């Protein structure tokens, strides 16, 4: 506990009381009364009353400060809440702006699509109008042809009536039938009909050329695939034969080698050759490629050579085995 500061002592008691009275009077705590130190009970009560006033003023000031502090805290809380509300409103505004931008982009896309549809619709209307004109021209030609056909039928009926009437008078008369009116091959063709016929000819020529081109490209691709597969097969056979020759060359260059080494080498060569043949057949069956007759003859010839070499290896192994058997019997 700290020692309180002492302002008054017996040497300055009078000056201290005078200073206190002036200070209390200036602050409005006392009016006419003064602090006096005496044995009078009234002076002591006056001192106690002044102390009570000071305590109450201190309590009121403390309460006022506490209320001000609470008000400040409430203001800070309101300010923080307002800031949070502002942030939330900003986020909602950004989301709304983004949504508006998306809707605007959709509207622009729909407008472009609508413009394209309008253009396509206009083109379809033009095509439909041309088709209607062409159909109208064809109907006109059909009606003309029908009228000509009706005229021909009427002419034939008239000729038949004349012949039938004359038949009773002259049995030797010949049936005279007027030649039907031939359609004029040089008759003018309407512009709509001419353009329609020309368009049909162009479409048919285009389709025929397209079909022929597709068939040619298909055959060309098939031919390239056959060439590629045949080249792969010939390369495989050539590599197999070369590897077999390379493997057999040391065997015939050293005829006086150790029989055990010769037997081991022959076994390795024979196994490698058989594995190569199996791999070749497996690849051939897996790819399911087709070869020409000439290339098939070459493949068969290579297979015969491979069979001959395999027989040579088998005979060599048999000879080495017999040699080893004789050596074992001797020892």
From Swiss-Prot:
GO molecular function: spindle pole body anchor activity
Single biological process term from Gene Ontology: meiotic cell cycle
Any coiled-coil regions, as ranges: 72-166
Cell compartments where the protein resides: Cytoplasm
InterPro entries referenced in this protein's UniProt entry, alphabetically: Afadin/alpha-actinin-bd
Keyword Cytoplasm: yes
Pfam name, any one: ADIP
GO CC annotations, alphabetized: cytoplasm; mitotic spindle; mitotic spindle pole body; MWP complex; nucleus
UniProt KW keywords: Coiled coil, Cytoplasm, Meiosis
Free-text function comment from the UniProt entry: Has a role in meiosis.
Family stated for the protein in its record: Belongs to the ADIP family.
Full protein name: Meiotically up-regulated gene 172 protein
Phylogenetic classification of the source organism: Eukaryota, Fungi, Dikarya, Ascomycota, Taphrinomycotina
Gene behind the chain: mug172
């Amino acid at each position: 506990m700290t020692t309180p500061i002492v302002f008054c002592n017996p040497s300055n008691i009078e000056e201290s009381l005078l200073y206190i009275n002036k200070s209390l009077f200036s602050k409005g705590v006392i009016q006419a009364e003064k602090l006096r130190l005496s044995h009078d009970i009234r002076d002591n009560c006056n001192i106690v009353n002044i102390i009570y006033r000071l305590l109450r003023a201190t309590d009121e000031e403390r309460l006022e400060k506490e209320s001000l502090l609470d008000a400040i805290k409430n203001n800070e809380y309101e300010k923080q809440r307002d800031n949070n509300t502002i942030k939330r409103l900003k986020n909602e505004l950004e989301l709304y702006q983004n949504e508006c931008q998306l809707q605007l982009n959709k509207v622009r896309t729909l407008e472009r699509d609508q413009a394209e549809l309008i253009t396509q619709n206009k083109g379809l209307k033009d095509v439909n109008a041309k088709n209607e004109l062409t159909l109208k021209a064809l109907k006109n030609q059909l009606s003309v042809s029908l009228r000509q056909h009706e005229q021909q039928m009427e002419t034939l009926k008239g000729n038949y009536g004349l012949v039938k009437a004359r038949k009773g008078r002259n049995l030797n008369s010949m049936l005279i039938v007027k030649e039907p009116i031939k359609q004029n091959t040089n008759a003018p063709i309407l512009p709509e009909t001419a353009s329609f016929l020309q368009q049909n000819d162009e479409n048919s020529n285009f389709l025929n050329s397209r079909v022929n081109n597709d068939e040619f490209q298909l055959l060309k691709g098939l031919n390239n695939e056959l060439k590629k597969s045949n080249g792969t097969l010939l390369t495989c056979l050539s590599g197999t034969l070369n590897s077999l020759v390379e493997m057999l060359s040391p065997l015939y260059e050293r005829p006086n080698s150790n029989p055990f080494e010769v037997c081991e080498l022959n076994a390795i060569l024979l196994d490698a050759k058989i594995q190569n043949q199996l791999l070749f057949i497996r690849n051939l069956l897996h790819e399911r490629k087709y070869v020409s007759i000439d290339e098939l003859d070459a493949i068969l010839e290579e297979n015969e050579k491979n069979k001959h070499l395999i027989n040579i290896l088998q005979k060599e192994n048999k000879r080495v085995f017999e040699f080893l058997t004789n050596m074992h019997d001797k020892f």
